[in-house]
Amino acid sequence: MFLLTPVLVAVVCILVVWVFKNADRNLEKKKEEAQVQPWVDEDLKDSTEDLQVEEDAEEWQEAEESVEHIPFSHTRYPEQEMRMRSQEFYELLNKRRSVRFISSEHVPMEVIENVIKAAGTAPSGAHTEPWTFVVVKDPDMKHKIREIIEEEEEINYMKRMGKRWVTDLKKLRTNWIKEYLDTAPVLILIFKQVHGFAANGKKKVHYYNEISVSIACGLLLAALQNAGLVTVTTTPLNCGPRLRVLLGRPSHEKLLVLLPVGYPSRDATVPDLKRKALDQIMVTV
């Protein structure tokens, strides 16, 4: 019969204590990570969309149509002009700042249409163009959007974002109050289309939809700067599903970015931030 000696009992006790201590450490580590990285993809939170079940292959349309290829038209500049144009474009974009104080002054709709057309020239996976730009000008609708965002943002700051994230934002003097959502003459909400639809009603795959739409957002920011307008890039955490329903967008569209657009108010201020030097962002091999 096997007998437990005092030494063996002691060893077993030590092992049990060690296991429980490590379990506690892992639990605490997971809690800390959750506080540091509180982001949850809104796609996982939108209860209004269809359940994610395996779908019949017949519901999807394969792209089989042929596309004619045509000669490429290109303008090549002399090297000196290339240097000048690239420098001027850099200097223009280097003046771009995130502006939270936006005037209510009217912005011509033609300008908004042009900057969105510019954004729509972005490349996309298999040329699916998986973006929808929703332009909001109606004051009542803007205020409803503000109410939803501020309600969720207050919870974000108080509970979801975690101490480190909130601390990192203090230097920007930002909080859950978003007055610019009322004052800006135009709000542009950019939705990614998770999939599209063919003419026969079947679903079309939208490859790399989030990357494609993100590139379009970058072009939109550059176009706004070129037009002399300002904005602040807003990613409404946990607001996407409610805003999508408010704006009557279908369930296969997910809100990616919201941009309040207009002229800066006369008393607008921005943080005196410095951008990284070239040698900190570029590596030549």
UniProtKB/Swiss-Prot annotation:
**Gene that produces this protein:** Iyd
Q: Which CDD domains match?
A: iodotyrosine_dehalogenase
Its ancestry begins with: Eukaryota, Metazoa, Chordata, Craniata, Vertebrata
What job does the chain carry out? Catalyzes the dehalogenation of halotyrosines such as 3-bromo-L-tyrosine, 3-chloro-L-tyrosine, 3-iodo-L-tyrosine and 3,5-diiodo-L-tyrosine. During thyroid hormone biosynthesis, facilitates iodide salvage by catalysing the oxidative NADPH-dependent deiodination of the halogenated by-products of thyroid hormone production, monoiodotyrosine (L-MIT) and diiodotyrosine (L-DIT). The scavanged iodide can then reenter the hormone-producing pathways. Acts more efficiently on 3-iodo-L-tyrosine than 3,5-diiodo-L-tyrosine.
Subunit arrangement?
A: Homodimer.
Pfam families under this entry?
A: Nitroreductase (PF00881)
GO BP term (any one)? thyroid hormone metabolic process
Cofactor(s) it depends on: FMN
Main location (coarse class): membrane
One GO location term (cellular component) = nucleoplasm
Write down the chemical reaction(s) this protein catalyses.
2 iodide + L-tyrosine + 2 NADP(+) = 3,5-diiodo-L-tyrosine + 2 NADPH + H(+); iodide + L-tyrosine + NADP(+) = 3-iodo-L-tyrosine + NADPH; 3-iodo-L-tyrosine + iodide + NADP(+) = 3,5-diiodo-L-tyrosine + NADPH + H(+); L-tyrosine + chloride + NADP(+) = 3-chloro-L-tyrosine + NADPH
User: What molecular function does GO assign, one term?
Assistant: iodotyrosine deiodinase activity
Its domain of life?
Eukaryota
Key words of the record: Cell membrane, Cytoplasmic vesicle, Flavoprotein, FMN, Membrane, NADP, Oxidoreductase, Transmembrane, Transmembrane helix
The EC designation for this entry is: 1.21.1.1
Transmembrane regions: 1-21
Q: What name does UniProt use for this protein?
A: Iodotyrosine deiodinase 1
Which positions does UniProt annotate for 3,5-diiodo-L-tyrosine binding?
126, 153, 157, 178
**Per the UniProt entry, what species is this protein from, by scientific name?**
Mus musculus (Mouse)
Write down the SUPFAM superfamilies for this protein, in alphabetical order: FMN-dependent nitroreductase-like
Compartments it resides in: Cell membrane; Cytoplasmic vesicle membrane
Tell me which stretches of the chain form a coiled coil.
Answer: none
Q: Which residues bind FMN?
A: 96-100, 124-125, 233-235, 275
Q: How does it sit in the membrane?
A: Single-pass membrane protein
Q: Which enzyme type, at the first EC level?
A: oxidoreductase
What the entry lists under PANTHER family is as follows: IODOTYROSINE DEIODINASE 1 (PTHR23026:SF90), NADPH NITROREDUCTASE (PTHR23026)
